Amino acid sequence: MKKISLLGSTGSIGVNTLDVVDRNPESFQILAMSAGSNVELFAEQVRKFKPKVASLYDITKIAALKERVADLDVEIIPGEEGSIAVATLPEADVIVSGIVGSAGLVPAIVALKAGKILPWQIKKL
């Protein structure tokens, strides 16, 4: 089973990745996930996939996220620190990054420096 850390779970790459994981639970597990600011969708995803670590980049919405997942055993880490934690989680086999543009650079670089597999995906050429 491949253990996945997912950066940008609420965008199209993230949503499609979660769809693949959902259809193949014997092959994949989400260990950690992050999102930008869509707290409603992200809370639903956290409730469904039950990661060990969840990160919301928009620190003004952390309280709302914590409230929505208070009954779950999930560590919530805000902001860029959280994205880095998701990208470098030791137990993760693969880091899937759906973060658009330069915002995804730091998590991608730290994931690679940590020796993680980081599949390359391009939405638009």
Set out the residue ranges of the language-model regions.
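N-terminal glycine-/serine-/threonine-rich beta1-alpha1-beta2 phosphate-ribose binding loop
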Residues: 1-102
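ADP-ribose/adenylate-binding Rossmann-like module
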Residues: 96-99, 112, 116-125
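Hydrophobic alpha-helical segments in the ANL/AMP-binding
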Residues: 106-110
